[in-house]
């Protein structure tokens, strides 16, 4: 189980990303728009830098919903590989069976 502080930090990042998503998208679009002047694009980059660091979606980390494990997490299930294995063997994940050939 991951430390509670790490899980809370991730939740805080999720909230910040949601809060600043619109501004971040607007500034990013302006900064990448080559039809705009260089001054406008530079200003948009400066505004992006003024946003909180944790408002950037790339700082989010996928974690297991059960254990909070940051690595080996499958996006499709939102679970770590070890938990997927346990739940699959128990028959709790529909459509997942042990491979045999």
UniProtKB/Swiss-Prot annotation:
SUPFAM superfamilies: Glucocorticoid receptor-like (DNA-binding domain) (SSF57716). One of its GO terms (cellular component) is cytoplasm. Keywords: Ribonucleoprotein, Ribosomal protein, RNA-binding, rRNA-binding. One of its GO terms (molecular function) is structural constituent of ribosome. Transmembrane segments: none annotated. Binds 16S rRNA, required for the assembly of 30S particles and may also be responsible for determining the conformation of the 16S rRNA at the A site. PANTHER family: 30S RIBOSOMAL PROTEIN S14 (PTHR19836), SMALL RIBOSOMAL SUBUNIT PROTEIN US14M (PTHR19836:SF19). This is Small ribosomal subunit protein uS14. It comes from Polaromonas naphthalenivorans (strain CJ2). The gene is rpsN.
């Amino acid at each position: 189980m991951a430390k509670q502080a790490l899980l809370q930090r991730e939740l805080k990042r999720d909230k910040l990303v949601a809060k600043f998503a619109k501004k971040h998208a607007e500034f990013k679009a302006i900064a990448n728009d080559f039809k705009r002047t260089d001054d406008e694009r530079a200003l948009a980059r400066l505004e992006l830098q003024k946003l909180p660091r944790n408002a950037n979606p790339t700082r989010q980390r996928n974690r297991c919903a059960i254990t909070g494990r940051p690595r080996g997490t499958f996006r499709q299930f939102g679970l770590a590989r070890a938990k997927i294995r346990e739940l699959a063997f128990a028959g709790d994940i529909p459509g997942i069976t042990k491979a045999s050939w």
